[in-house]
Design a protein with these regions (language model features):
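N-terminal module of bacterial RNA polymerase sigma factors
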Residues: 1-31, 38, 128, 179
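Internal acidic/polar
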Residues: 2-5, 92-117
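C-terminal edge and immediately downstream basic/flexible tail or linker adjoining helix-turn-helix-like DNA-binding
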Residues: 11, 93-96, 100-101, 122-125, ...
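Sigma70-family region 2
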Residues: 13, 41, 54-69, 89
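Structural recognition of an alpha-helix C-terminal capping motif at a helix-to-coil junction
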Residues: 34, 48-55, 68-80
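Short, Lys/Arg-enriched C-terminal cap helix and immediately downstream tail that follows
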Residues: 36, 87, 130, 135, ...
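Arg/Lys-rich amphipathic alpha helix in sigma70-family domain 2
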Residues: 63-65, 76-96, 168
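A short pre-motif secondary-structure segment
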Residues: 137-141
Length: 181
């Protein structure tokens, strides 16, 4: 796979916009999808958000000036699209979906033949309870293992505020896991 600089050179200077965009999609689709699904925990919603992300990338790629890394710019768009989606969700729909997922997962969890990882189940349940911004910070740091500087490029904000947000998320998850042990 080509380096980001080579892809961007193709896009901006060689007249190969479609080809370069296709390379970006192939290179980053899976990674962005994993980031989005961890926040929305629904396949169809994640697919829609990923599609909206790439629509915005297509629209704004001509203006991308490489002030940040391509992957952090893509993550910022994906994260913003995800946060917008989460905000737009009505309270009723959110609770209906959450209730249905928890009920079905809980039924599987209580099934003697269910061999899912109990810790993973509890962790996902705890993460889902976090406010969207804390959820984003936690997922980027814990699962994606990004540096705070990279997360700052993606989400905006200062490194200090992101560290505090991660600490609050970590504390809430830890408390949830202790209370639900």
């Amino acid at each position: 796979m080509l380096e980001d600089k080579e892809i961007l050179t193709m896009y901006h200077f060689e007249g190969k916009e479609d080809y370069a965009f296709n390379l970006i999609m192939r290179k980053y689709s899976d990674r962005l999808y994993r980031h989005i699904i961890k926040m929305v925990q629904n396949h169809d919603d994640a697919d829609d958000i990923l599609q909206n992300t790439f629509i915005k990338v297509w629209r704004y790629l001509p203006d991308f000036r490489e002030d940040s890394k391509l992957f952090t710019w893509l993550y910022r768009i994906a994260t913003n699209e995800t946060l917008t989606f989460l905000k737009k969700e009505s309270v009723k729909r959110f609770f209906m979906l959450s209730s249905a997922k928890i009920t079905s997962t809980h039924q599987a969890y209580s099934d003697p033949f269910f061999n899912g990882d109990q810790i993973q189940f509890k962790l996902q349940k705890a993460i889902k309870r976090l406010p969207p911004k804390q959820r984003a910070v936690f997922n980027l740091k814990y699962f994606e293992d990004l540096k705070y500087e990279e997360i700052a490029e993606i989400l905006g904000g200062t490194v200090g505020s992101l560290k505090a947000s991660y600490h609050h998320a970590y504390t809430k998850i830890e408390q949830f896991l202790k209370e639900n042990d």
